[in-house]
Structure formats: structure tokens, C-alpha cells
């Protein structure tokens, strides 16, 4: 019996060549609408789907393949006698290949100002149904959803006279991944439309961006996946201009650096190691900001990731060139800057669009057996919630450094303490099990620079010992959430040393 293939694709890339090769191998081609027209125009013998169903396409093409003559031919078990008798009784011919890719829903909803009705019209019904039917019956039917697989199918047909079962099974798995991702994208789009934040079932889909050399450690395997419609302001959407592929740790650190530098409108530079900032600086120019970030901790920046929120010019590139860095992230690089930095073979240069609207996204953490989902911590300082709780108020300079330090400390692993002075971090205490321990680390790092500095804490002081440690180091102002049952002890201690202290009313734990 002559083998038959249904071909109906929105992505026409490679389809004419593939269809011609199938036809040359004796496969009868059945097609629909635009695909049929393209194939016929290129001389491919093709049968209209209506000639198989004996029913016209209706409802503007919404119904054309949803017919027993199609799905009976796809789902029949070939060595089941009853199935074969039923096919013969209803004059249904088996179908051996389904070559389908789906309406461009993703591309449609990515367009600016797309309407709901425009999006809905790009929800494919017949395509996924045929693909799923073929994939379910992959013991007998070859389902092809990816143009990248056309060559493999032809190669095996020529070599073996059939597509091997193991290949059909792999293609079936790809089909179900593809249709599941397609449905998940539609579900997410409509969920966003109706405003459900935490639905009873959460459908998420990601596309493999790259295989990674290894994971967090060399003995771990890893890959990097991105959202189909990832934010332009993201590491997933970053453009790499130079250097070898990003590693697992590179991606994590680059993401952390990008989130921190996004806190600032003024020129800002951030250096990150192991997802914690080792130096952050702001200034009137990006060169000044970077110099501050470097001086914050010139030891830890070695082998780190630097993110800048201004273009890298020749002067800035010369500074960066003198330091061993894994990655530099910026909105852009001048030609002169690229000429300087690309002399270093291993440095990765990334650009990210800083001008786009930064939409709030769910923050997802994988735990064994499930996911934790929360909204992003995008809270910024609100004058309405700031409260000076000490006898002395911060000076104008202290206010500037307090708000700077508060923007940084929310991105440091808890328990977190940040010391800042003159628009730069001078001490970072990260990831400690007690708060005074984090303060001591930050103070030790700051050294003599702690005199006249300010301190930011991501959570309240359970006791007054952190204020005591800060006072002994010469800190003059503190910003913290407040909310401890022993707040009064900390306030009294601050008053004792003439320290100005501000409560924000907002905690910034980060795990």
C-alpha cells in the first residue's frame, strides 16, 4: 500500500525540498490551505485535505482536519484486525507521516498592542490534534514537528526503507514536549489576561538556549533554558559580543550583577562574586562609578563579573582591560572599547537593553518535590514609610549613602550588612547565621574607612550588639527595617553614640 503524509506547516522553511524527497520515495502528499498552494507552485504532487475528508474547509479554516478520515487513518493500530476492518468499512486509508508545525502564537503575542482576538485566532487546534494522534500511534506513524528533523527522516527512509521505531519514539516525545509547551504558553497568556497570580496549576515552558560544559561544579551536568518570551532586560536575552560560552556560574553571577545595577538611575558599576556584590559604586560618570566599585574590594573583583549601566567607551575599556574579569555587561560598547577588550581572548562581553520597560516577573525557586513562587522584590525606598527613630537625624550626605546602601543590601545573601561611604560600598557581610557576625565581617573589610560610614541591614536587629559594633567602628548612620521586640534597645544604643537611625518598615531577606 502506498504510504501517505499529511503536511501542514506555518513555517515553510525546507518544506518544499522535504516534500519533494518524500514524493520521490513514493509517499503520497496530502496538504491544506497555504501549504498545499506552496507545494503545488513548486511542482510537488499534492492532494487536497478536502479530497480525503470529502468535506470542505469551513469556518475560515478553523475546521479542516478534524475528521474521522484523518484521525482514523492516524490512530488505527495496523496489526489489529478489528481496526483494519473498521478502516475498510468506512473507506479510511492509513496515514504514515504527519508533518505539522503550529500557528505562530508566540510570535503573535510578542507583537506590541496585539489584541486578545488576534491572539486567539493564532491558537492552533487541528495541528496539535494531528500531531498528538500521530505521536500516540508512533509505533506505526512518524510525527515531525521540527524542520531540523526533515533530514533525519529522509536519511532513514533511504537507508532502511522506514523511519526506525526508536527515531519515531524520539520524534513522538518531541511532539508532546512541543504541544505541551504550546498549550502552556497559551495558558500563561490567558492567565495573565484574567489576572490570576497563583493559579491552582502552574504551567511553565522553557526553551533550551545552550548546553553548559558543566554545572555549579565539574561533576554536575547542566543546561541553560530561557522563557519563550523572556524579558529583553535579562541575561537570557543578552547579546554576547565576545568570549567563550557562559558557564553555569557565569550565568548566575551575571544575573545577580544585572539585578543590582538595575537599582540605579545614576551611573553605576557593580562587581559580583558568587552572586554577592563585592563592590558597588555610583558617580557622575561611569568611570567614576567603576573606580569606586573597584576600590571597594580590589581583591575580590579579580575574576569577577562587572555590570555597568552606561556605554563602555575607550577610557572605560582601558580600566577594565587592566583587571582579570570573567564578564562585562553594559548597554553597549563603542568600537574603540571593543578593539581594546577583545584583545583578551577569554573575557565575555554582553550587552543588555537597559531602555526597555522592566516588567515584574514571578520569582521561582526549585525545591525538592516542588516550586516556591513569589513576586519579585522590587520594593524601593518610600519616603512615606521611612522613619527617623533617633534623636539625631541623618545629614544630607548620610541620607544619600543610606539610600544607596539600602538598594545594595537587598541583593546580598542574608543575614546581610552593607557599609557605604561616598557613593560606594566599603564592606559587605553576606550569608551569615547571625546579624552581628555579618556586621563584623563588613566592618573588618572596611577597616579605617568605616569611620564616618553608614550601615544598612536587610532585617531588624534582634539585639543592640550590631549597633554597638557599628559605633565602635565609627559608623554614623544606620538604616534597617525595624520591627524587633527589642527595637528600643537599639534606638537607645544609637542615641548613646549619636548615631542617626532610620527604620524603613520593609525587610529584604534573600536566600
UniProtKB/Swiss-Prot annotation:
Catalysis performed (reactions) = (6R)-10-formyltetrahydrofolate + 5-amino-1-(5-phospho-beta-D-ribosyl)imidazole-4-carboxamide = 5-formamido-1-(5-phospho-D-ribosyl)imidazole-4-carboxamide + (6S)-5,6,7,8-tetrahydrofolate; IMP + H2O = 5-formamido-1-(5-phospho-D-ribosyl)imidazole-4-carboxamide
Q: What does the record list as GO biological process?
A: 'de novo' IMP biosynthetic process
Establish whether keyword Nucleotidyltransferase is in the entry.
Answer: no
So what family is this one in? Belongs to the PurH family.
Q: Which NCBIfam families match?
A: PRK00881.1 (NF002049), purH (TIGR00355)
Q: What is known of its domains?
A: The IMP cyclohydrolase activity resides in the N-terminal region.
What is this protein identified as? Answer: Bifunctional purine biosynthesis protein PurH
